[in-house]
C-alpha cells in the first residue's frame, strides 16, 4: 500500500481554536434531536410546495432531460410523476430539476437561494434507501435550511449574485448538512461532509441573459454534489478543516473583504422560517413588482394604449440580478420569467401572473408595454432588504395622471393557494384519490414511521 494511503491524517492541536467548519458541524450534531414545532410545520409546507412544483413541471423539457439520463431499474429511488426506479443520485438530480422547473420554488431571501430544491430531494432519496421516521427527516431538513441560509447570508451580496449562482454555492453545503444529519454522522464526519461540499460549488449567472437552461441543472448538481460529499465523508474521506475559513477557503476566496465571518447556527429564529413561497412562477426579484402592478391593475382601470411610461422601483439587488432589468425581446420562457418588465406588463395587461402568461412571448401588446417599463433603485427598499423585499410600481398615463402602488414586502403564497396548486398538479398526474393520500402523508409527516412512502405515492404506473 502506498505511503499516501497509509499516511496519518493531520489533526489540529487540542489547544487550537476550532475552525468554522468544525464549529458548524458541532452545532449540527448538538441540534439533531431538537425539532421546534413551528419549524416542523413550516417544513411540511415546504415539502408540499416542492411536490406541487415537481408534479407540474415533470413533463417540461429540462425535467424530461434530467429523467432521461437516469438509470431506470438500477435503484430504489423514485422520480416524481414517473414510473422510474433509479439510484439515489439520479433521483436527487431529476427531482431537484423538476422542483425548479416552474421557477416557483421556495425562496430564502437572505441567501438569495432556493434551499428546498436542494435539501428535500436528497432527504427523500435517502428515505427510500433506508427506512426513516418523520421526526428524523424533519430535523435533517431544518438543519439543511439552517446551514444554507446562514452560509448564504455570510457569502451572497448583490455583486456576488450578479456573477455567481447563489443556489449553486449555498446548495451543496445545505444538502450535505441535511444528509449528514439524517445519516446520524458524528461531528468529524459532518465536518468532512461540509468541507468536501465547499469544493463542489458551481454556477455562473450568464444564463439569465438568454434564458438558457443552466439554471435548472445548477440546482440538480448542487443537490447531487451535497449528497456525494456526505457519502464520501461517511466512507472516511477527509475534508480540510479550513475549507471555509482558511487562506484559500470558500468564504475567504469569494467574499470581497477576503475574510471569513463567524457563522452561528441555530442562534435565534430558524432559517427555515425566513423562507417564503412564491405566488407567481417568476424570478424572486420580479415577485413584488408584479404583485404591486397586479394590485394597481385590479384597483384602477388602465388602458394599455394610454400608458406613457411605467416605473418599477426596486431594491439594488433586484435591479442588479442578471436578466431582471430587461425589457425584451424574449426568445425563451426563462428569459421572460426573469424579467421585471415582462412580469409588470403582464400583470397590468392580463391582471394575472401564471403559466399562461408565458405562452405567447411575441404578444405585441405585452411587448409594447414591457418596453415602457423602467427599473429604478429605491434607497429605502434597498435598506430594508433582505429582511423585507418591497417594490413600487407607478404608471403615467397620457391624461397626465400617475397611478402608483407600493408594497413594503412580498406577499407570499398562502397555504390554501399552495394546497390548491398541489391538488391540481398531483391529481392530474397520479389521480385525485392518490393525491389526497399523498397530501395526508405530508400533513402527518411528523408521525410517519416511513417517509419513503411519500415518494412511492408519487409514482405513476406508466410513463406519462
Language-model segments: which ranges?
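Terminal-appendage/accessory-domain detector
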Residues: 1-112, 209, 214-224, 231-464
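Hydrophobic alpha-helical hairpins/lids featuring a short glycine-rich hinge
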Residues: 98-155
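Active-site nucleophile and cofactor-binding loops and adjacent substrate-binding regions
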Residues: 111-117, 137-141, 159-172, 215-219, ...
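Well-ordered alpha-helical segments within folded domains of soluble proteins
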Residues: 116-124, 171-178, 223-227, 286-288, ...
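Active-site cavity-forming subdomains of large catalytic enzyme subunits
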Residues: 130-136, 153-163, 176-193, 206-216, ...
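Short, well-structured alpha-helical segments that form the helix of a local strand-helix-strand
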Residues: 141, 145, 191-194, 438-439
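Flexible glycine/proline-rich, aromatic-decorated loop/lid segments
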Residues: 196-204
